[in-house]
């Protein structure tokens, strides 16, 4: 029997990645299509220009298939994963009626407002891509996180008229929805021509980008926390029943049908802040790295490894993109002295990511009355040994890195493998397709320093800075009482 292959699509904020796997979870080839910079005319607007989402998928698909030297008939399916908390407003024919709305746009924190008569459907990014790939008006229910009329008990659209009225999207404007691991449709000849994916290939549901990443990381037990390092940095653990009015976390649908994850508060513009610093350093960093035969990222990690844990008190508040209900918050770096250079800033950002997530994790676990025994770190940031050690030290737990750290596409492949019957269940698929690369053990002296730095210092920093930021916001923008936004776990 010939070897079989699965394609996993990972739609993100800055690019679309398409990866082909064999059934043992090995990467065969991969393609990538960059997204254009978002249209951000003001602090509340973030839109994808043109038909950028589809164009990036087509580019990534062509890139992938141009590298594949095998028999296309051995490719058995495609798992579609795309970013959550976004909106696609479509005409009756499924084409965009307006620019696609990013999760960074303030409008997605509020119920839909029907102001454009051309809009026939309101859907997620995965819904839009499903239609472009298959011609179907279908989507996976698990990508409807936020301002959508979802019944979390039935995993379906709500049948409660009051709920439908609250979110202001009539049923006829919503796509039909189905469970993760089910077939949405098949690649049309037109989509095959545009993407170079084989026509007729089944397209399988996953969920939203973060839960499918948790599946690709191998999150199946109750003793593990997953930290997903992306533009938005997420914190997830396995869930049981729907919680009643949680404060420090919220339930989300996982990539396994009828199974929940619990998600703690994350960091908006998380790894973006690392890229921001790298790009600000510009040509100087590139030239320094080239002289040492290193990438810019490797040079940053090399130099930051020489900075003492705790950065001598240099701390970063990671509020480069705030929640709409807290518009006064701003990114802050505090604690400089004249001896510090960019390596200190870089390490401070890494440490502050870990410390922020540790505090959010503690709040979540204290409320659940359950703590993890180890953490899995996913995303490109986990390539840094320094960052991995910082996570181990700050959490004072073993921090694991997998052989495949871009786990969203692998999770999509796992959904496809189970959905098409190539594995009998998710436990078997994960056991065969997910492999641990290495584990970082906490260094006791570092863990003690981070704990002392956090308690009463970093943990309470924004209690002091928020007072000043609120005053400066009102000088620049007027009274905070005029802010029109909604706060709840369903749109955090």
From Swiss-Prot:
Its EC number is 2.7.1.-. The keyword Kinase applies. Gene3D superfamilies: 3.30.420.40. It is an enzyme of class 2 (transferase). The lineage of its organism: Bacteria, Pseudomonadati, Pseudomonadota, Gammaproteobacteria, Enterobacterales. GO terms for biological process: carbohydrate metabolic process. Pfam families: FGGY_C, FGGY_N. Belongs to the FGGY kinase family. The gene is ygcE. Keywords: Kinase, Transferase. GO terms for molecular function: kinase activity. The keyword Kinase applies. CDD domains: ASKHA_NBD_FGGY_YgcE-like (cd07779). It comes from Escherichia coli (strain K12). This is Uncharacterized sugar kinase YgcE.
